């Protein structure tokens, strides 16, 4: 296999990793491909972390890394005024230094004000581990990036979940665009992966945080309805006789016991 093809395969495997299980995927890949492939795998993990806006521990704070706060090989946090390197496997900040945020149009105070309002909303609405960020969009002087990441890892009960919502708000046109994505992986006596998402486009937005709250509440309600439909209709349509016991499965009780729908919606 050529080196480019090998890198492509490694990137595909890393990008398909379930939430909260990247370290296990890394360990398995090292066993399969040997230590000689370590740098290729770590490069793929770096790309995964940036694309998925993974939170990194920096001086006891959770800081989201993304393409919006990447500066060379480092990442900056404009609210806490630091710039840092990242150990992408351990998800920890290194070589942390002071950072002075400057922007042609957006002041640090504007970011801090939006940051604080967003914090209030998230404390009320996200019961899991939640991280968030407000970053200027490079080369787009009137645009701000807003990122929310919530994780709930429960390996003792064989499931992990991840919520990510990312938005771009234009201060001049008052337009808000973005995407919400969720993923849940359940792997006790099987392998069930659930993914859902929604594209967002809103105009005439004055209160950004209030609009985000409404959007995400509606998405959560739609998610509840889709789980109900999955439980009451889709899974029941799959009912069949088993070859050994020739008994029927009560799909309503079975899928209900997995708690995927309720826990994903409630962030448990």
From Swiss-Prot:
The keyword Protein transport does not apply. The modification Phosphoserine is found at residue 17. Keywords: Acetylation, Actin capping, Actin-binding, Cytoplasm, Cytoskeleton, Phosphoprotein. Its main location: cytoplasm. GO terms for biological process: actin cytoskeleton organization; barbed-end actin filament capping. It comes from the Eukaryota. It is found in: Cytoplasm; Cytoplasm, Cytoskeleton, Actin patch; Cytoplasm, Cytoskeleton. Gene3D superfamilies: F-actin capping protein, alpha subunit, F-actin capping protein, beta subunit. Present with 4380 molecules/cell in log phase SD medium. Component of the F-actin capping complex, composed of a heterodimer of an alpha and a beta subunit. Interacts with BSP1 (via C-terminus); leading to recruitment of the F-actin capping complex to actin cortical patches and the acomyosin contractile ring. F-actin-capping proteins bind in a Ca(2+)-independent manner to the fast growing ends of actin filaments (barbed end) thereby blocking the exchange of subunits at these ends. Unlike other capping proteins (such as gelsolin and severin), these proteins do not sever actin filaments. This is F-actin-capping protein subunit alpha. It comes from Saccharomyces cerevisiae (strain ATCC 204508 / S288c).
